[in-house]
Amino acid sequence: MSAYAELHCLSNFSFQRGASSAAELFQRAKALGYQALAITDECTLAGIVRAWQASRDTGLKLIVGSEMQVEDGPRLVLLVEDLAGYQGLCRLITRARRRAEKGSYRLLREDFAEPLPGLLALWLTGAGEPLAQGRWLQQVFPQRLWLALELHCGQDDARHLQQQLALARQLGLPAVACGDVHMHVRGRRALQDTMTAIRHHLPVAEAGQRLFANGERHLRPVEVLQGLYPQALLDESLAIAGRCAFDLGQLRYQYPRELVPEGHDAGSWLRVLTQRGIVRRWPTGARAEVLKQIDKELTLICDLGYESYFLTVHDIVDFARRQHILCQGRGSAANSVVCFALGITEIDPDRSTLLFERFLSRERNEPPDIDVDFEHERREEVLQYLFQRYGRHRAALTAVVSTYHGAGAVRDVAKALGLPPDQVNALADCCGHWSDTPPSVERLQEAGFDPQSPVLRRVLSLTGQLIGFPRHLSQHPGGFVISEQPLDHLVPVENATMAERTVIQWDKDDLDMVGLLKVDILALGMLSAIRRCFDLIHGYRGQRYSLASIPPEDPATYEMIGRADTIGVFQIESRAQMSMLPRLKPQNFYDLVIEVAIVRPGPIQGGMVHPYLRRRNRQEPETYPSPELEGVLKRTLGVPLFQEQVMQIAIVAADYTPGEADQLRRSMAAWKRHGGLEPHRERLRRGMNRNGYSDEFATQIFEQIKGFGSYGFPESHAASFALLTYASCWLKCHEPAAFACALINSWPMGFYSPDQILQDARRHGLQVLAVDVGASDWDCSLEPIPVQPARAGNGPPGQPALRLGLRMIKGFREDDARRIERARRQRAFVDIADLGERARLDVRAQELLADAGALQALAGDRYRARWEVAGVERQLGLFAGLPSQEEAPVALPRPSVGEDLQADYHSLGTTLGPHPLALLRPQLAARRCRSSRDLLAVEHGRSVSVAGLVTGRQRPGTASGVTFVTLEDEFGNVNVVVWRDLAERQRRVLVGAQLLKVDGTLETEGEVRHLIAGRLSDLSPLLDGIHVRSRDFR
């Protein structure tokens, strides 16, 4: 039987061209008996690591390559022969991508001026003068050029074959058979046509000759190819494949070495810095156990060759601290005492149980992964520092493969099949944005579609095939790769969408597979808010706080947390967390670690939450299968809540080594996507049986492990987050004005809008002052309270007032605000004309200020301010020389309370006047709607109706289709539970209403109250144009 190697094949990483994944292509090629498969995506190696994995999974040889079009020149397929050829291909792709806009490339003849050893070229003849092109290519690729013949059962195949063979003879070139493969099986042709139409922004019906004439560009049986090509051309494919010996496993990555001073190597310098950190962290001396652990970690770090990596992360964190940028390491790195000593993380080993193997293990072939959060508004300074320190040729961001999800896939397919725009939008609305399935029949019927329509069935079929396909490369939120050698010796580099940034073509999973190290430079809004809060406190009181100096274990802070009074704080501000807080009632830092971790899909789906709560509330006894496991589970009352505990159970009860336990952890994280967990079921059972544990216990542990596959927190990660949770709660409890001010100045971030933060602050008795050009800066600020306002409840003692900043005004520019600040420092504004002249404000800026009520001190009210800005009274003065009686000032009506309210929301997104529902309360009462305050007196199980502004909609993946809605009225919030069937029946009201009435049943459990919805009504017309921001399904 004749053999064959396919040398020209595109995967779906030739975006919107290739219609099959590498895994599908390799499985099919293996089944057809191919000897090798080249993945040659167009000017990219973005999918080559996945192809390498597919090659290893199937045992079929991978040839690395790329298809390229030379500008004003030939089209080529370049195949990698050896390491030098791979590096040359990476450099070519990098040059072509860097000189073009993101998503395109420009490959020039001059790029081939330097020798390209180790690259074999297949010439795909087409436009242009063939003899001239061929002779140029022979000079570029001497003895390494073939003429590629690609036949697809066209009417002209025989003539084309003879012409091409004649050209090859004329130039003295060998010829080879290729397939120009775009899909693994013929059945993907419809998808390939659809993707072509999507790429060209045309309906399929108008794509014409842009579509292939038939479905022959798939992996074909060798017997079929023998009927098309002379045998010599098939044999030549094997000869070329035999020359291509490169394997991605040959790549050798080196970390930068320039951080080591003279007289040291990386290991000795890391020990010096760690020793300095020990003195700083433990001024009175560290415990012997801590020193022993540090020595163990340093030995392993040096043995595995990761010293330079730790030095680099330390350098990044040190830079941030020198620039007063708040930062903190998190994730598995918080298991490392060395990271704590170096200042990378903040988890004191005396406050938590650490498992270093979760971070770094001799037995696993995986580099460490250190995540560091920085203030979200200053992270760019850190990124640019890295570019400047290492150079753009050695530093770049990691890519993220953006894939098709339900809404995007159905939208693109429906457009390509020619559906009108209104139907395209309606179909997309039937999908959840991140859904990985086409819309359900029920959702389609609700939207007025006929699920049996042939066109719709075709749309849904193609959508199902497209979901999960790569759509484009985007930028990782912060993954940064730094190398000793130029990065384009390892992987191609291209431009990011954002200027001054470059991105490698591989994502995080690719880096792990080939052993490249990255550090995550992440942005965290809460760090910005905390640093701003520290600055505000220092400016107002003269007291300087840091994360380390916040008083620990403060009873008042935990009492506030137990009441679920946590709007605006970190991690425990969602409705799910706020429902859990009164049940768990954290009393100390470790309780807070548990709180952060327990409201996650892993513990929920693993059935761990309710047993833990019952044991915590002494409704069920603590039980342990053995004294050894009691040591593992005691701190969580016998219920495994953290990944580290699962690993320790495997070690203690089933005889796993630490490295094997980490492999179990990796399998937990990936089993839903890739499987691989089942082999551990039997391994755990046998190991536990051997140590005296029952099959029932082994099954229970395995099911809990599967739950962790749905996003369970490592304890180290939860502890890192809990530090920020506690800090934000302490600030909210003891410095509420500064905290609210800092949150708004750091927005957009977090869970709540500025309006919700301000409403919460006012409910706590804080005085909020209106935006005013005579007092407001760009940012919100703190002011002394000149006169204690009369109010029903007194605010926290000693708290300043919060003055709204000009940043609150929609559309107002910061430059205008800064000029107002500078002019005001010289002297106060006399009138609007004086403001406009000295702050150099155009009419648009003055109108925005007038509409926001920021000119009331100069004009009296919004209407008068707008009148003066328009210059109406100045224009009346033009007629002053005419004989007439003296004109009295124009009498303008003052805006009503409702008009001011509407203007506030339109301009500021919030109001300091009465809450909208306070004005609507009589109308709501006529509809028998109770307030959130009234619900406090309603008994469990009673039917009740409420109405409120929708401020949040959530549908967690663990909630079996349940939607949680948060309603706000003038007194507080109401948590509403909408079961799946009601949500589907009344989806339009649920998703679209701004003012929602809910008829339902009140359920109470201790201090937790929920309204179980029975009917939903949209009362939004009562708002009369007021728009309220809602956080939906995030």
Swiss-Prot record:
Taxonomic lineage from the root: Bacteria, Pseudomonadati, Pseudomonadota, Gammaproteobacteria, Pseudomonadales
Known catalytic reactions: DNA(n) + a 2'-deoxyribonucleoside 5'-triphosphate = DNA(n+1) + diphosphate
Function statement: DNA polymerase involved in damage-induced mutagenesis and translesion synthesis (TLS). It is not the major replicative DNA polymerase.
UniProt cross-references to SMART domains, sorted A to Z: POLIIIAc
Pfam family, one: DNA_pol3_alpha
Intracellular or extracellular location(s): Cytoplasm
EC id: 2.7.7.7
A GO CC annotation given for this chain: cytoplasm
Gene Ontology MF terms in the entry: 3'-5' exonuclease activity; DNA-directed DNA polymerase activity; nucleic acid binding
Entry's family note: Belongs to the DNA polymerase type-C family. DnaE2 subfamily.
Keywords: Cytoplasm, DNA damage, DNA repair, DNA replication, DNA-directed DNA polymerase, Nucleotidyltransferase, Transferase
Single Gene Ontology BP annotation: DNA repair
Protein name: Error-prone DNA polymerase
